[in-house]
């Protein structure tokens, strides 16, 4: 019987780093997170997949044209959450310097309020549930990559951990 201690340690490391990222990144500040949430909100509200229209500014922007499987699963996961504060969360930081190399001040795209503090409610709770779902998917990717490397290079026991 094979020992999967190295895989377990790798998954623990992955989950630890992902959890630190989850807790240290404000709501909607991860890459395109606000727009992905906009797609999920459309589906969870029963409006189906968003329709892309040229020149129309929406809460989902270009993400409305992405493949829908993740969005359908994510919408099901957050459908029970009352996102009463969703539209107010799209409040841009007028002084934000997003994408400016070397910036150390005003690095956030959105304004952040005490709605992001514990206990988690509304949009913040929904975003964290989705992040945890993404971490679970990431664990599957790490494990699958480990097994593929192990199958392709059975003589090199350390390669799958890379």
Each language-model region and where it sits:
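Transmembrane-helix signature of polytopic, membrane-embedded enzymes
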Residues: 5-8, 98, 104-121, 145-162
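Hydrophobic side chains within alpha-helical segments
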Residues: 35-39, 69, 134
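Start-transfer (signal-anchor) and selected internal transmembrane alpha helices
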Residues: 1-19, 129-130, 137-146, 150-151, ...
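Interfacial juxtamembrane loops and adjacent helix segments
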Residues: 44-133
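Short alpha-helical patches at coil-to-helix transitions and adjacent helical residues
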Residues: 33, 66-70, 142
């Amino acid at each position: 019987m094979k020992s999967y201690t190295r895989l377990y340690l790798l998954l623990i490391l992955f989950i630890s780093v992902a959890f630190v990222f989850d807790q240290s990144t404000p709501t909607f500040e991860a890459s395109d997170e606000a727009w992905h949430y906009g797609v999920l909100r459309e589906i969870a509200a029963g409006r189906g997949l968003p329709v892309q229209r040229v020149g129309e500014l929406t809460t989902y922007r270009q993400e409305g044209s992405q493949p829908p499987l993740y969005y359908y699963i994510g919408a099901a996961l957050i459908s029970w959450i009352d996102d009463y504060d969703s539209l107010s969360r799209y409040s841009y930081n007028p002084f934000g310097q997003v994408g400016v190399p070397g910036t150390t001040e005003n690095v956030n795209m959105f304004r952040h309020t005490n709605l992001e503090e514990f206990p988690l409610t509304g949009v913040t709770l929904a975003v964290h549930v989705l992040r945890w779902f993404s971490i679970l998917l990431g664990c599957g990717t790490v494990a699958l990559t480990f097994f593929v490397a192990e199958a392709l290079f059975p003589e090199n026991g350390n390669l799958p951990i890379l």
